[in-house]
Amino acid sequence: MHDITLYGHMTVDRIFDGFEEKQTLGAMANMWRTFKHIAPDLDIGMCPTSIGEAIVYIDRDSSTRYSNFVPDIKTNTPIIKQSKISHAMYINKLLDVSWLKELTGVISADVCAGPRVDSSLLQHIDYFFIADEDAYADLKTMCKDTKGHVILHTNKSSVVSDGRYETNYKIDDSMFAPKSNVLGAGDMFASSFLYGLHLGLQIEEIQEYAHDTTSKLIRTEN
């Protein structure tokens, strides 16, 4: 049994950091890389269902990134693996989500910029990650759609709610890295959050750990 298994998109990223170009792997690879940084011995399963390509521009002055994403050059139906935590990436971009209800263990998912997520999928999700700019409704509505918790996050804060209770966390200004390469920051945050969940931490502790770890990783990679 794996500790955490990743499903969904893996991409070949062509990145322009200003005018400097490099190529790397993204999406699922971002989470894998984060796990290897924070917990090298964690047993990570990987089941890409879509392989695509992306062009990414990083604007350090505003700490933002812009991308054009062709997600489904190759697709495959995953073989579901036994796992303590199963995470589905970018479910608003997946062509086939029929396997989502078959995932094992604690089930989490996230979305990326693009079409609105099909809210009927969220009935299968224990932890749903969505960035503030991608929110399709208010937090209360998204919680009603989701089986478990919604993690609504920005680059400086997050709210975790199950519709009854919510916990809020905001990083200290000193932890924010200005003019930084924020590529993959959302994936770093989700990975760190899931690792905290794997450790059995309380939600408040997980939020603090996830934000702190993401900030440190961004500083390390810049």
Place the predicted regions along the sequence by residue:
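Glycine-rich phosphate/adenosyl-contacting loop at the front of the ribokinase-like
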Residues: 1-46, 179
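Ribokinase/PfkB-type carbohydrate-kinase core domain
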Residues: 2-6, 36, 43, 54-169, ...
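Short active-site-adjacent structural elements
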Residues: 14-15, 158-161, 190, 218
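General alpha-helical segment detector with a strong preference for membrane-spanning helices
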Residues: 13, 114, 135, 190-191
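Active-site glycine-centered loops adjacent to acidic/histidine catalytic or metal-binding residues
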Residues: 9, 131, 186
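Conserved post-catalytic alpha-helical subdomain immediately downstream of the catalytic base
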Residues: 24, 29, 41, 149, ...
